[in-house]
Amino acid sequence: MIKNANIHFNHQGTPVANDFDDIYYSDDNGLAESYYVFYQQNNIDTRLQSHDQAHFVIAETGFGTGLNFLNTCQHFTDHLARQQVQKQLNYGVKRLHFIAFEKHPLSVSDLSKILTAWPELNLLSEQLISQYPINLAGCHRLEFNNGTIVLDLYFGDALESIKTMSYPRSGIVDAWFLDGFAPSKNPDMWQQSLFNAMVNISKVGATLATFTAAGFVRRGLSDAGFTMQKVKGFAHKRSMLIGTLKHTNDTQSAPSYFNHDVSPLSNVAVIGGGIASSCILYSLAKRGISSQLFCQDAAPAMGASHNVQGAVYPHLQAKNSPHSELFAHSFLYAKRLYKQLLNDGFSFDHSWCGVLQHAVKQPLVDRHENLAQQQLWPQTLMRNVTAEQGDTIAGVTTGYSGVYFEQGGWVNPPQLVNAMLSAAHCLSPYKSTFNCHIEQLKKTSNGWLLFSNGKQFGPFSDVIICAGEHSDAFAQTKALPIVGVRGQVSHVQASEQSTKLKTVLCHKGYFTPAYLDHHCMGATFEKNTKSRQVTEQDNLSNREQLLNFYGHCNFATSLGNITAAKAAVRCSFIDHLPMAGEWVEQSDYLTAFANLRLGKRYQYQALSKKQQGLHIFTGFGARALCSAPLCSEHLISSLNNEPRPLSERVSQAIHPARFIVRDLIRNKI
């Protein structure tokens, strides 16, 4: 579990870490120190003008008060303003990406107090405070100023965090801020293994700067691959260290068989129309990448995203699995994104009323007890509640204990999809083509061509298929192992008793608080059928399921008539995880990774061939509202040679090639 820093303030008002007996920044002028030591000595201003990519990546060991980050953001904002004034918009860096590692994060109350000392940073500080993560280990992606600044804030040990990262072979970091506490007081932040790990994720030519001039630090960084030198330190300090990476670590482990160095995205075709495609378009728009949406329906969100109320909460297990890691961080990112959309004026009906997962059967009681015993998840993310506590939360009497997701709730999916599409269009206008069923994809020397009813579209540098159950409809993707699951949600009239319900209830299905005088009740699960016809039998099944668990409750027995329903086919896979990544023909993998049949130890022997520009983004099932936003960021970050918000193990768990790889390892193909 992540533990907050234990601090006090000295006579100058500077925060001091009690566990390390060291100050977070200079008593004299912390802001000036930050600028001189890190920003100026890494020559950031000049490099922002001449960098060969649209994004610049800085990594910091020791986030602390966030002062270095906020100060850098302020100067980067000034850089963008100068570009605008000078109309130099066709070159120079457009997005700042900041990676920071923090083992003992400050509490949000301590951070708020500390940052009041820097009123000139207020606009950025307020954004940081409003998004500041809960104490969950791993990468928290925070976004500032319409996505022009991205902070990947890792909670946990720096070395262990770097080991989890997914990155291309050429590296991702352009500059390092080494700002842990003094080496004599916090030696873990200045160990050789950390320096070597830094090199693994750095580009050749990456620079570093640090306040210390300790000899063992200079020698360690030199041994790792940096050319080091001493320069004048800040204020009264005699010297400090700077360095440049001349070569990468030859002994580094190769990234996984899913990683490639890619050409940046330029013009992308997105096939879909629901939550998944709206997330992709939004991620592309934040980067100013040209795109076009192709939707077979007359309007967005006409398929599986067409429900009136969709529950938003993470699906967590009693173990630190890739599944749990994905959904925990995806949920927190989705909440931040939805809050930002609302703050920006893009409205959609919703209620963050919490989600109460009831233990309606003994196996669920046992599962919830196991969740509590493992203590993997912060109480602010989920907590176990007794029957009495649960009934108080829900506002109705059920008699069930359960797990409560306080930050969960429900949103209106069609409205959310349209809000995201509108927000994307405001950031970077894109084309939309509706009533357009794409029948064929063809790769040419100039890019991808799309065909529909005798019309040709393109060429496009990349195609991202977000078509749900129809994602396997193309010659290139017919081998996708999609599991289609039909589901029907019923809309039932609220009663005086049922309107007392204050939170979403989950049992075998789900039941929402009243909205427009109705509750959403469902959903059915039926495999091997593609019918979208609403049936009375499924309405009866939804009511029977509710009464089976809540037949003793007034809110359930007093409900009115079912007046409407929605039916759709969810797209999923047998491991209940989505797909986000490049789609490669099975024959290519069979050739490139034949050694996988000899055992897992051969999994890093080769990389598959250069990406062809066809990508899959589907399989979210009933959890797209939770997981699609962060998975979208991960996919577009990967395709744009940016830092990725999901770990290497999660990247592999959701990659389209995972089933091929598993079958090779098991010698099934």
From Swiss-Prot:
What EC identifiers does the entry list? 2.1.1.61, 1.5.-.-
Domain of life, per UniProt, equals: Bacteria
GO MF entries:
flavin adenine dinucleotide binding; oxidoreductase activity, acting on the CH-NH group of donors; tRNA (5-methylaminomethyl-2-thiouridylate)(34)-methyltransferase activity
List the residue ranges of the region (FAD-dependent cmnm(5)s(2)U34 oxidoreductase): 271-669
Record region (tRNA (mnm(5)s(2)U34)-methyltransferase): 1-246
Query: A cellular component term (GO) from this record?
Result: cytoplasm
For whether the record's keyword set contains Iron-sulfur, the answer is no
Cofactors: FAD
Per UniProt, the keywords (alphabetical) are: Cytoplasm, FAD, Flavoprotein, Methyltransferase, Multifunctional enzyme, Oxidoreductase, S-adenosyl-L-methionine, Transferase, tRNA processing
**UniProt record, GO biological process:** methylation; tRNA wobble uridine modification
Q: Does the keyword Metal-binding apply?
A: no
List the SUPFAM superfamilies hit by this protein, alphabetically: FAD/NAD(P)-binding domain (SSF51905)
Cysteine disulfide partners in this protein: none
Localization per Swiss-Prot or TrEMBL: Cytoplasm
Q: Catalytic activity annotated for this protein?
A: 5-aminomethyl-2-thiouridine(34) in tRNA + S-adenosyl-L-methionine = 5-methylaminomethyl-2-thiouridine(34) in tRNA + S-adenosyl-L-homocysteine + H(+)
- Principal place where this protein is found? cytoplasm
What family is this protein classified in?
In the N-terminal section; belongs to the methyltransferase superfamily. tRNA (mnm(5)s(2)U34)-methyltransferase family. In the C-terminal section; belongs to the DAO family.
PANTHER family referenced in this protein's UniProt entry, alphabetically: SARCOSINE DEHYDROGENASE-RELATED, TRNA 5-METHYLAMINOMETHYL-2-THIOURIDINE BIOSYNTHESIS BIFUNCTIONAL PROTEIN MNMC
Job of this protein: Catalyzes the last two steps in the biosynthesis of 5-methylaminomethyl-2-thiouridine (mnm(5)s(2)U) at the wobble position (U34) in tRNA. Catalyzes the FAD-dependent demodification of cmnm(5)s(2)U34 to nm(5)s(2)U34, followed by the transfer of a methyl group from S-adenosyl-L-methionine to nm(5)s(2)U34, to form mnm(5)s(2)U34.
In its UniProt entry, what is this protein called? Answer: tRNA 5-methylaminomethyl-2-thiouridine biosynthesis bifunctional protein MnmC
Q: Which gene encodes it?
A: mnmC
